[in-house]
């Protein structure tokens, strides 16, 4: 009898974990399709790494540009392809190389006072692990494309 209960419990666990894995694979596919369609939009630039971005306002061409050794002050909000906003700051100061790779790459393309929108594929973001605790406001599921609206206020 104990063996049957253990096997039953094991089967339920496998079924639940399999469903969750399928959900992540469906989410991955949705994100990949989003990026493929987004790349066709007018004004979208795709880099060799797969980062997509659009320039909303170019900023000052004569101003300093970010690099890994510099700090920046930015205003941003981040969301997923389904519109879920996971983060937003009116003012954030940090080193360029402390962001996820896609965000870092995008910042380096900006001029001071520029406004860009980044579309960061999961492999340049939080990868197949995601970020944060599931069920919390800041949770980012595995395989998520990150969409950031970024204003570069200052290069420090």
Regions flagged by a language model, labelled:
Residues 1-17:
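Sec-dependent bacterial lipoprotein signal peptides
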Residues 5-7, 19-156:
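Cross-family detector of peptidyl-prolyl cis-trans isomerase
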């Amino acid at each position: 009898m104990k063996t049957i209960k253990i096997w039953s419990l094991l089967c339920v666990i496998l079924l639940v974990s399999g469903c969750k894995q399928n959900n992540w694979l469906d989410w991955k596919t949705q994100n990949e399709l989003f990026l493929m369609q987004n790349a066709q939009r007018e004004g979208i630039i795709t880099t060799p790494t797969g980062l997509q971005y659009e320039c909303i306002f170019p900023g000052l061409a004569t101003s300093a540009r970010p690099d890994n050794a510099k700090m920046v002050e930015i205003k941003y909000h981040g969301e997923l392809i389904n519109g879920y906003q996971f983060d937003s700051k009116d003012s954030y100061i940090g080193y360029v190389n402390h962001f996820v790779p896609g965000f870092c790459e995008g910042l380096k393309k900006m001029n001071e006072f520029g406004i860009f929108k980044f579309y960061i594929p999961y492999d340049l973001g939080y990868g197949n692990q995601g970020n944060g605790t599931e069920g919390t406001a800041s949770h980012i599921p595995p395989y998520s494309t990150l969409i950031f609206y970024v204003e570069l206020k200052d290069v420090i």
